[in-house]
Amino acid sequence: MDVFVDGELESLLGMFNFDQCSSSKEERPRDELLGLSSLYNGHLHQHQHHNNVLSSDHHAFLLPDMFPFGAMPGGNLPAMLDSWDQSHHLQETSSLKRKLLDVENLCKTNSNCDVTRQELAKSKKKQRVSSESNTVDESNTNWVDGQSLSNSSDDEKASVTSVKGKTRATKGTATDPQSLYARKRREKINERLKTLQNLVPNGTKVDISTMLEEAVHYVKFLQLQIKLLSSDDLWMYAPLAYNGLDMGFHHNLLSRLM
């Protein structure tokens, strides 16, 4: 369909200007003027109708098909977007909270497992230490019993041995008759050794083996002294005191004179 351009419209209006064409009104027929004016008015009306149809078709194509606002509740697009964002944010928040709860439960479970393992390890360690201490006590007890005859040289060692023996008896480590008899026998031997230490000169200052050797020499000295003192002729040769020296000279003298 033809559309008027700006220049054509002005020229057409100039052709129908009554001021310029007043002299030719009478010459042109009246029906010709009416036909031209009706043609111009129809053309304008048709052009406006075409523009209205195009604009209505364009909006009808864009709005109902691409953006169906009528189908939306309220027909408000920003409100719909805001509600969608809020629902999406709530879903993300709830999922994040669930993940945090799962992580906390897992951490609590792991911590409980660690505590249980530590308690089990501590109990096992205590049992091992107690068993080792019992073994050490038994070994110390056996060592004291075995060495009571050779290392109880002074009063303190003898008292410690007797105290330990009483402690073992109260604990019930030796409850059979044989062990009780052996313990009593050891106690009697320790008492006699203590008495012998007090009789032998310097017996409390040496160990058991040295003390027993000195006791043998001291007994020989006493025998020689008794023999010499009992003789009427040799009493002046009898030794007066035991000084730990060799008594061979006195024995030779006694055998030679007797």
UniProtKB/Swiss-Prot annotation:
UniProt name for this protein: Transcription factor RSL3
Bias (Polar residues) ranges: 130-152
Tissue: Expressed constitutively in roots, leaves, and flowers. Expressed in root epidermal hair cells.
One annotated GO biological process: regulation of DNA-templated transcription
Keyword terms: DNA-binding, Nucleus, Transcription, Transcription regulation, Ubl conjugation
Classification via Pfam families: HLH (PF00010)
Stretches for region Basic motif: 173-186
Effect of disrupting the coding gene: Strong reduction in root hair number, density and length in seedlings.
Upregulating conditions: Induced by jasmonate (JA) treatment. Induced by low phosphate conditions.
Predominant location category: nucleus
